[in-house]
């Protein structure tokens, strides 16, 4: 009985701590030409207005789309909000939310065994409205002086992994590092950014939603283009490889060690 009570209290404490961490992210809106991007932002513990900070942009998956400005914090937010990490890596962390009816990228499914890893990308079209707003938000943070332009980082999971690869070629000179998780991208676009910053790619070896071939394809294209790329593939792991990625002990130290050339 005591053991059950202890486990119950442990679960309550864990969920309470996570909720408390997520409440540290302030609710914001970025409005441009009548379009609204809802996002959450975590500021450093000792934030000073005139100091420039690293910025980490995290793009969520399709399951976290909506307009509640809450769901996008489901994965990864606790890692950056952990007090030890905030002390060690002072940074501004941004979690935007894509509306339910939209996506970070425009793509369509094809044969999962074809050369594009099962997806076709509309690279001849402008970015989706949510991604465009994210791009403009990032630029505005640099323009307003709160962001260090040499330490802008981007990563994301699933749909956000696709969004990460997408924003890299649309803003090829903007970021210092990227960490796409269980996503994919356009191999023909990697030359635009391959040699500009390091990339750490993650994927589950048994992913039934976004086949692992998507990341393998991008990693090969990046290596062929001379990129500094790391690849972590988790055997037997399904689509939720973001759990493994965010648990990587070197992830944060790797991210914040990168500076734009």
Can you describe what each PLM-predicted range is?
Residues 17-55, 63, 91, 126, ...:
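A domain-start/cap signature at the N-terminus of enzymes
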Residues 139-193:
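Primarily recognizes the serine-hydrolase "nucleophile elbow" in alpha/beta-hydrolase
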Residues 64-131:
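Active-site machinery of serine-nucleophile hydrolases
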Residues 46-51, 105-157:
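Gly/Ser-rich "nucleophile elbow"/oxyanion-hole loop immediately N-terminal to the catalytic nucleophile
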Residues 181, 189, 198-261:
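C-terminal catalytic histidine-bearing segment of alpha/beta-hydrolase fold enzymes
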Residues 74-84, 182-192, 213, 217:
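Alpha-helical scaffolding within the catalytic cores
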Residues 89-91, 193-199:
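Short, proline-enriched alpha-helix->beta-strand connector loops that line the catalytic pocket
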């Amino acid at each position: 009985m005591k053991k059950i009570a202890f486990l119950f209290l442990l679960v309550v404490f864990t969920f309470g701590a996570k909720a408390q961490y997520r409440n540290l992210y302030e609710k914001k809106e970025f409005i441009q030409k009548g379009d609204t991007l809802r996002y959450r932002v975590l500021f450093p513990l000792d934030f000073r207005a005139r100091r420039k900070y690293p910025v980490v942009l995290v793009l969520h998956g399709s399951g976290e789309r909506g307009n509640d400005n809450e769901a996008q914090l489901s994965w990864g937010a606790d890692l950056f909000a952990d007090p030890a990490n905030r002390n060690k890596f002072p940074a501004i962390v941004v979690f935007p939310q894509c509306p339910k009816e939209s996506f970070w990228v425009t793509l369509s499914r094809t044969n999962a065994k074809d050369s594009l890893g099962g997806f076709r990308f509309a690279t001849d079209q402008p970015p989706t409205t949510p991604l465009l707003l994210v791009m403009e938000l990032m630029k505005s943070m640099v323009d307003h002086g709160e962001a260090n332009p040499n330490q802008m980082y981007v990563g994301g999971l699933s749909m956000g992994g696709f969004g990460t690869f997408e924003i890299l070629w649309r803003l090829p000179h903007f970021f210092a590092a990227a960490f796409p998780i269980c996503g994919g991208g356009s191999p023909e676009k990697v030359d635009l950014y391959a040699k500009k910053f390091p990339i750490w790619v993650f994927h589950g070896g048994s992913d039934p939603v976004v086949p692992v071939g998507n990341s393998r394809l991008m990693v090969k294209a990046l290596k062929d283009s001379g990129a500094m790329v790391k690849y972590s593939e988790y055997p037997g792991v399904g689509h939720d490889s973001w759990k493994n990625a965010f648990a990587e002990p070197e992830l944060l130290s790797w991210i914040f060690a990168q500076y734009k050339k």
